[in-house]
Amino acid sequence: MSKVLEQVEAIVEPITNELQLELVDIAFEKEGPNWFLRIFIDKDGGVDIDECAAVSEKVSEKMDESDPITQNYFLEVSSPGAERPLKKEQDFENAVSKYVHVTSYEPIDGRKMWEGTLVSYDGTTLVITITDKTRKITCEIPKDKVAKARLAIQF
């Protein structure tokens, strides 16, 4: 995580904790000429627009005080949505038995992408059952090789 994102997280996390919300992710991204600071929050049952607005207002106030980002940016606060990213240990543990999408930094057994059910997670290895054509295959993916992971919608 970059130094700027660490500073932003230090500002945001006490706010989300105070409001009994989970800080899911923070992203600082450039799109075209504009920069966006995106904060994703959640709680059991999901968050509503009023909770997003409350976090946005409090974060904006604190960011103006400490000013860790020097350039102009747009602040966005939202739910992570149905395809929530899996980043923290707890995210992976909560995703066991759910449908997930995982990509790796390098090929593992000839693959860099898996989409299937997360059967287990022991802190170091993800075990995913995928369907390859008509047969089910169980794959083991070392956590340190995972580039990105998220919940997925199964069609």
From Swiss-Prot:
Pfam families: DUF150_C, RimP_N. Keywords: Cytoplasm, Ribosome biogenesis. Its main location: cytoplasm. GO terms for cellular component: cytosol. It is found in: Cytoplasm. The keyword Hydrolase does not apply. Gene3D superfamilies: Ribosome maturation factor RimP, C-terminal domain, RimP-like superfamily, N-terminal. GO terms for biological process: ribosomal small subunit assembly; translation. InterPro entries: Ribosome_maturation_RimP (IPR003728), RimP_C (IPR028998), RimP_C_sf (IPR036847), RimP_N (IPR028989), RimP_N_sf (IPR035956). Required for maturation of 30S ribosomal subunits. Belongs to the RimP family. HAMAP family: RimP. This is Ribosome maturation factor RimP. It comes from Listeria welshimeri serovar 6b (strain ATCC 35897 / DSM 20650 / CCUG 15529 / CIP 8149 / NCTC 11857 / SLCC 5334 / V8).
